[in-house]
Swiss-Prot record:
Cofactor note: Divalent metal cations. Mg(2+) or Mn(2+).
Molecular function per GO: magnesium ion binding; manganese ion binding; NAD+ diphosphatase activity; NADH pyrophosphatase activity; RNA NAD-cap (NMN-forming) hydrolase activity; zinc ion binding
Protein name as annotated: NAD-capped RNA hydrolase NudC
Residues annotated for a divalent metal cation 2 binding in this entry: 179
Species whose genome carries this gene: Vibrio parahaemolyticus serotype O3:K6 (strain RIMD 2210633)
Ranges of residues in domain Nudix hydrolase: 130-253
GO CC terms of this entry: cytosol
Enzyme Commission number(s) from the entry: 3.6.1.-, 3.6.1.22
Length: 260
């Protein structure tokens, strides 16, 4: 962990300047060099990891005196996974500083703790860590078809797999079954874990599953979805982009179908 006073010893680093779910890039890449080179306030920087042997530093855009062009984190999905994960971490820490400005315990003003990535109340000294929202995401297979859905926010016609937030007192497997049934009307079986991905929009943790169709007729909930259909591997619509765990689930399901 890099403390505030240690930052001056960083010669060259990757600099993650973040605001909301946006990040600063230079010529399409995370800027690499010294803080002085980019006129960045290194006293406000924190190290969040290392990439290719160099430190990765996080700074909030609000701490800058200069205006910088920002792009969505989604535009970085093609970056190498270790780097994208660090950018996601920077986004989530930035969101922490904005969403936890005041202490939920006593209402006092929170400040960034110098020894760990948490906000700390200046009055009661309570530590508040980044809020992470657990979500499931699942690819459902029915014989040689995969279930894909379209959401109203997908303006480009993109289809993806079913996802939703975990409820209190619910297992991940129960959440998978509930979300699929609520959004599409079908029941699933053979629910099995696939992997996970931090999803900093703004602070979700996507826990991915594969499942098989069990019973029921497809009946989309049009308050949640624009469409839901079974697709064969040769009739796939535009799907979630490479770099997302949704795309990984789709590719795994297609691979499983083709290998049977």
């Amino acid at each position: 962990m890099l403390r505030k006073g240690d930052v001056n010893r960083v010669a060259n680093a990757y600099w993650c300047v973040v605001a909301g779910s946006e990040i600063w890039l230079v010529d399409g890449a995370v800027p690499f060099g010294s803080a002085e080179q980019f006129s960045l306030p290194e006293e406000n920087a924190r190290q969040i990891g290392d990439y290719l042997g160099s430190p990765v530093m996080w700074i909030n855009f609000a701490d800058l005196e200069q205006d910088l062009p920002l792009v969505s984190l989604r535009d970085c999905l093609h970056f190498p996974e270790p780097l994208f994960m660090l950018l996601s971490k920077a986004i989530q820490y930035g969101h922490m500083t904005q969403s936890l400005r005041f202490c939920p315990q006593c209402g006092g003003r929170n400040f960034l703790n110098n020894n760990q990535f948490a906000m700390q109340c200046g009055e009661c000294r309570t530590l508040h860590y980044p809020r992470i929202f657990p979500c499931i995401i699942v690819a459902v297979r029915k014989e040689n078809q995969i279930l894909l859905a379209q959401h109203p926010r997908h303006r480009n016609g993109m289809y993806t797999v079913i996802a939703g937030f975990l409820e209190a007192g619910e297992t991940l497997e129960d959440c998978v079954a509930r979300e699929v049934h609520e959004e599409t009307g079908i029941h699933v079986k053979n629910i099995r874990y696939f992997g996970s991905q931090p999803w900093a929009f703004p602070s979700s943790m996507m826990m991915a599953f594969l499942a098989d169709y069990d019973s029921g007729e497809l009946n989309p909930d049009y308050t949640e979805l624009s469409d839901a259909q079974w697709f064969g591997v040769k009739e796939m619509p535009p799907v979630a982009p490479t770099g997302t765990i949704a795309r990984a689930l789709i590719e795994q399901t297609i691979s499983d179908i083709l290998s049977d």
